Amino acid sequence: MKTLLLTLVVVTIVCLDLAYTRKCYKTHPYKSEPCAPGENLCYTKTWCDFRCSQLGKAVELGCAATCPTTKPYEEVTCCSTDDCNRFPNWERPRPRPRGLLSSIMDHP
């Protein structure tokens, strides 16, 4: 009887995933997905590229074992709870007016 009980316990442990897997938002496509084993941090990386003035900052979301290092023009935030790296909610830059009126507005 003890052998049967021990066998059931071992089978249960093998079949169940007892290790917790962090879930983070990832880009391309933007959705929440489980992270790979050992990756327990979510990160949000933002930077300006050539489209920054029209579309706003570029954004990369993902999982990491350690918080990614940044380049001088990048900003990175890391967090350690499920889905804590939502897409940043900021206003897109407004296009500047063009034409004669814009030159008047530029010099009040």
From Swiss-Prot:
<keyword id="KW-0732">Signal</keyword>
<feature type="disulfide bond">
    <location>
        <begin position="67"/>
        <end position="78"/>
    </location>
</feature>
<dbReference type="InterPro" id="IPR003571">
    <property type="entry name" value="Snake_3FTx"/>
</dbReference>
<dbReference type="InterPro" id="IPR018354">
    <property type="entry name" value="Snake_toxin_con_site"/>
</dbReference>
<dbReference type="GO" id="GO:0099106">
    <property type="term" value="F:ion channel regulator activity"/>
</dbReference>
<feature type="signal peptide">
    <location>
        <begin position="1"/>
        <end position="21"/>
    </location>
</feature>
<feature type="disulfide bond">
    <location>
        <begin position="79"/>
        <end position="84"/>
    </location>
</feature>
<feature type="disulfide bond">
    <location>
        <begin position="35"/>
        <end position="63"/>
    </location>
</feature>
<comment type="similarity">
    <text>Belongs to the three-finger toxin family. Long-chain subfamily. Type II alpha-neurotoxin sub-subfamily.</text>
</comment>
<comment type="function">
    <text>Binds with high affinity to muscular (alpha-1/CHRNA1) and neuronal (alpha-7/CHRNA7) nicotinic acetylcholine receptor (nAChR) and inhibits acetylcholine from binding to the receptor, thereby impairing neuromuscular and neuronal transmission.</text>
</comment>
<feature type="disulfide bond">
    <location>
        <begin position="48"/>
        <end position="52"/>
    </location>
</feature>
<keyword id="KW-0800">Toxin</keyword>
<keyword id="KW-0528">Neurotoxin</keyword>
<dbReference type="GO" id="GO:0030550">
    <property type="term" value="F:acetylcholine receptor inhibitor activity"/>
</dbReference>
<dbReference type="GO" id="GO:0005576">
    <property type="term" value="C:extracellular region"/>
</dbReference>
<keyword id="KW-1015">Disulfide bond</keyword>
<dbReference type="Pfam" id="PF21947">
    <property type="entry name" value="Toxin_cobra-type"/>
</dbReference>
<keyword id="KW-0629">Postsynaptic neurotoxin</keyword>
<protein>
    <recommendedName>
        <fullName>Long neurotoxin 43</fullName>
    </recommendedName>
</protein>
<keyword id="KW-0964">Secreted</keyword>
<keyword id="KW-0008">Acetylcholine receptor inhibiting toxin</keyword>
<dbReference type="GO" id="GO:0090729">
    <property type="term" value="F:toxin activity"/>
</dbReference>
<feature type="disulfide bond">
    <location>
        <begin position="24"/>
        <end position="42"/>
    </location>
</feature>
<keyword id="KW-0872">Ion channel impairing toxin</keyword>
<dbReference type="InterPro" id="IPR054131">
    <property type="entry name" value="Toxin_cobra-type"/>
</dbReference>
<dbReference type="InterPro" id="IPR045860">
    <property type="entry name" value="Snake_toxin-like_sf"/>
</dbReference>
